[in-house]
Amino acid sequence: MAEVPGAQRPVLAGGPEPRDPLDCWACAVLVTAQNLLVAVFNLLLLALVLGTILLPAVIMLGFGFLCHSQFLRSQAPLCTSHLRDPGFTALLVTGFLLLVPLLVLALATYRRLCLRLRLADCLVPYSRALYRRRRIPQPKQIPVSPGSRSVPTPGKVWV
């Protein structure tokens, strides 16, 4: 039998309540958009951290490859006035040696930023798009009068 767009689906006892098809589609689009925004922000943050921390090694490797006679043979005044081939070889070696420790430092910094910003908590599971959240009824709180003493809970000791 065909489903009517406004009709409610039957609810299983104790389970989550399914959404209407149109509501489910709209929520799925919104969940996808939010997850894509979080992913883009993660990539931008990763690019910023990697670009900042790896910049010294990238500059050394760039000048080493740009100015060494075995690679590009550039005759730019910046290359010929300061160093010769042994100096550019030293730049290449130092750049490659610095690359791995700086990469580890950059990834540790990115992880710490992700944990501090709680970016993993911003990702929404798709089950939220398919099912409505049920409200769990809260137990009623009995107001305590100012003159009465509160009874300590078992297992906790106040010193």
Curated annotation (Swiss-Prot):
It is found in: Cell membrane. Keywords: Cell membrane, Developmental protein, Membrane, Transmembrane, Transmembrane helix, Wnt signaling pathway. One of its GO terms (molecular function) is PDZ domain binding. Its main location: membrane. One of its GO terms (biological process) is negative regulation of canonical Wnt signaling pathway. The keyword Transmembrane helix applies. It is a multi-pass membrane protein. InterPro entries: TMEM88. GO terms for cellular component: cytosol; plasma membrane. Disulfide bonds: none annotated. Belongs to the TMEM88 family. Inhibits the Wnt/beta-catenin signaling pathway. Crucial for heart development and acts downstream of GATA factors in the pre-cardiac mesoderm to specify lineage commitment of cardiomyocyte development. PANTHER family: TRANSMEMBRANE PROTEIN 88 (PTHR28628:SF3), TRANSMEMBRANE PROTEIN 88-RELATED (PTHR28628). Interacts (via C-terminus) with DVL1. This is Transmembrane protein 88. The gene is Tmem88.
